[in-house]
């Protein structure tokens, strides 16, 4: 497999080091005899057949906690387009410690040590998920709070205060984002992978500074419709099933 697939043609090597270019290049001379082009991979992703609005229950006997995931397929990754703007939209809902979801489930209710939501995308596929590990006896109540928060944000949108906090938080975080060697490596890899110019950072800063409340609310309505989502719960099925069915959802047993 490695002889056929792992070849250097078309690859790029990125290094962040205190070595000069000549010394670093010399140290990589061991790779000079590695030649060739790997066979192409034909990748395809099957369509999901899950039922939206249902709960898929994975049993773990006597679990003290339940893991909840609520989500759907979503966008592939982009750098300055709708995917990036949607990550800004999600910030107030589930992308920060003081997001609505975390303040509700952790700080107010005490159901979990942390709850969050996020978009995750690659070149071929993407998804949106809201997730937490919660006390087993609060599984049903946690789902209710998740759904209420997502639905409220989708329908009523972001507040002025949340928009300002998002802008300040993202800008402050980005100011330190490329300080470490590992971060610099990731920065360069991102430029090469997406064929970017280094000023994409400035482009993102402009988006953060100028995205409007109306734009964010349109994205929330478009991407956070709970009727388009399904739920996965991992926990003690014999105690959870009656609770989950009492919420009015169809519950399907699922094995991994």
Explain the meaning of each model-derived region.
Residues 1-40, 108-109, 113-256:
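Charge-rich, well-structured scaffold segments of protease-associated domains
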Residues 39-98:
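His/Glu-based metal-binding/catalytic segments typifying zinc-dependent metallopeptidases
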